[in-house]
């Protein structure tokens, strides 16, 4: 009887997992070689800091983001010089083997003028992002919006309609706040603002369709700076539209705060089948590269099992059973070795990004965790025999000892990669 009960619970759990991990249907939007939406992999995006005034430096930054793994890179189109630099940046990317349409132009009220004034430069963009909250003001707002949409229609360029919590259409927000105040039991302000974001995005997308832009040329986003608001807004969006959704926590902050907030919000939504492309927006430390944002996007997707980008190294934190001097050094060395070798492996050994390696500190969980990985090594803890057991595909392969355990293990890793990924 107890066994039947457990089986029933497990069956219900499996069904729940199947529901949670099933992506919601959306249109497919093609941006050059990249497809956003449908059943396609979640797309990693980033944004160049730019603003150097040096087109060569700006191109190097975009190239660096692409080489780090960003599949689409957004740049600010806020001046004549900025839009005139796009063809050069595109050519740099093409010369390095990247998608010719991976640049996204992001502009505010000035972008309508720039696109009209420099159409040949704008044609080098793969996608254009516009913000309904500041595309224009007063009687210029709709005209600017429609000018961009008509340019996109004429030149087969997709559009992201990106609403931002910090630049929400003030007229829409004021109207909804006023209407809410007349209710018998008004909603809290944050609820009204969430609804305003969704309404702004959807009405703008429908207006773009009315002008003539096909639904499969539209991506939408509603950026907020708090995790609960992000989840609420995108859950609403997912229920009422079939446009692909661009996820991200705007103004996430820096350091651990930004990493945790972005990871929590994006992961929750993706695990509920919501979202088709992601960007992590972190405030960088002085001199820090924005490639960290790309790596974080990749780590989010890999940690929740949606995409693999690199060999996964699993390791325990260590405790008073482990020898920190040797164990922590081995973990560091293996991680560095894998990072250094990934570009070579990925070009010569297809599928290697799906490989897992376990580096464990003692006999308590070491052998078990190592057996779950493709390759694993269990170091001796205090009081254990001074040998390291190595496991391959769930079976014990050998034991290593001496002062060059790292070098011996690396040789085993290289041999495994050459045999199983070719």
Swiss-Prot record:
Q: How is the cofactor bound?
A: Binds 1 [4Fe-4S] cluster.
Q: List, separated by semicolons, the cofactors it needs.
A: [4Fe-4S] cluster
In its UniProt record, a GO molecular function of this protein is: 4-hydroxy-3-methylbut-2-enyl-diphosphate synthase activity (flavodoxin)
Top-level EC class as recorded in UniProt: oxidoreductase
Output the InterPro entries linked to this UniProt entry. Answer: Dihydropteroate_synth-like_sf, IspG_bac, IspG_bac-typ, NO2/SO3_Rdtase_4Fe4S_sf
Q: Does the keyword Iron-sulfur apply?
A: yes
Highest taxon above the source species = Bacteria
Q: Which UniProt keywords apply?
A: 4Fe-4S, Iron, Iron-sulfur, Isoprene biosynthesis, Metal-binding, Oxidoreductase
Task: Name the job this protein performs.
Answer: Converts 2C-methyl-D-erythritol 2,4-cyclodiphosphate (ME-2,4cPP) into 1-hydroxy-2-methyl-2-(E)-butenyl 4-diphosphate.
Q: Which family does it belong to?
A: Belongs to the IspG family.
Protein name in the entry: 4-hydroxy-3-methylbut-2-en-1-yl diphosphate synthase (flavodoxin)
- What's the source species for this entry? Ehrlichia ruminantium (strain Gardel)
Taxonomic lineage is: Bacteria, Pseudomonadati, Pseudomonadota, Alphaproteobacteria, Rickettsiales
Name of the gene encoding the protein in the UniProt record: ispG
